[in-house]
Amino acid sequence: MQREWSIAGNVLVSRGEGHDAQAPDVLVLDTDEAAGIASDHATRDLLSQLPHAELSFVEHIGERAAGIVVAPAGERLSRRQGRFGVLLSRSELVLVDDGDVCTTLLGQLAEERVPVESPAGVLCAMLRLLLREHPATLSRVREDFERFEALILEGRTRIDRGDMMADARRLLGFDTFYQGLSDLADDLSEDEALLFPADCERFAALSRQLDRLGMRLESLQDYSLQVHSLYQESIDVRQNNVMQWLTVVATIALPLTFITGWFGMNFPNMLLINVPWGYAVAAALCVALAVAEIVFFHRRGWLSFGMSRRKRRGQHGTDRHR
């Protein structure tokens, strides 16, 4: 598998469009083909890291830059984590990709006729294309957490925990992606010996865009931690209410158990045991004790769940303000 692209009229075109006479500006190779053209040990060592790299990076090897770009899983281009190698010089960009991430990006750049002037400009445009939908994705994730927060505040502890964890994992993947890509963009923006001044400015602008996305991501991660903490607090409140009910039930049953156990011993000459109305008196005593305990617990507010009490207090506060 090999794809060749050229820059003509400041746009990217496929080599099949009448530009076969000139050397290609962009090459897409698989790992076996790239290993065949790797002329130095440093490049071969970098290519060996491609299958298991987790963070984007770039290194300067002679008169070119070599690195790996790692896109998080779940991107629109691939459901799995996408990786591709980069070999960049002033006159050529070689992309090492065993999948279709690079060919998809390059095809979209050519279809949209995105302005590019050099191989480094093509790489920068590809990275921007990877980031195109991230602002909208971060907005959707924030809307998800706002919905989770609203459900929790309404007292609904049964929310979609799977969706919450999926959003948290997505944010974690974006964090790693932004860190690595920001370092890569910073390194290339400062390499004036390899890149043209216009390309250095493009990568500097890309680095600033990543900084803005990183700050937005950081605030969103803080918000997600608050929602997770609120969710855990609601679980704790629910557990405390269950334990409160169990304590109340056990407290009500304790004197009744004592009375029934006392009369169950069947000792001679026990109070009320030999009179015809004794059973009725004992039953009435048990009912009176149970009612007295229920009234006592109700006045203390122990027979209401905490969330319900808070709701009633909020309603009373609203009525008072009215």
Predicted regions and their residues:
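Hydrophobic alpha-helical transmembrane segments and their immediately adjacent juxtamembrane loops
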Residues: 211-322
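The cytosolic transmitter module of two-component sensor histidine kinases
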Residues: 157-160, 199, 206, 239
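A beta-strand-loop signature enriched in Asp, Gly, Thr, and Trp
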Residues: 199-202, 206-207, 213, 244
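Hydrophobic alpha-helical transmembrane segments
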Residues: 113-116, 184-204, 221-236
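Short, well-ordered turn and helix-capping elements at secondary-structure junctions
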Residues: 69-73, 192, 231, 266-269
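General secondary-structure edge motif
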Residues: 121, 158, 165, 200, ...
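Peripheral, non-transmembrane regulatory/ligand-interaction domains of membrane transport proteins
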Residues: 1-190, 196, 212, 302-308, ...
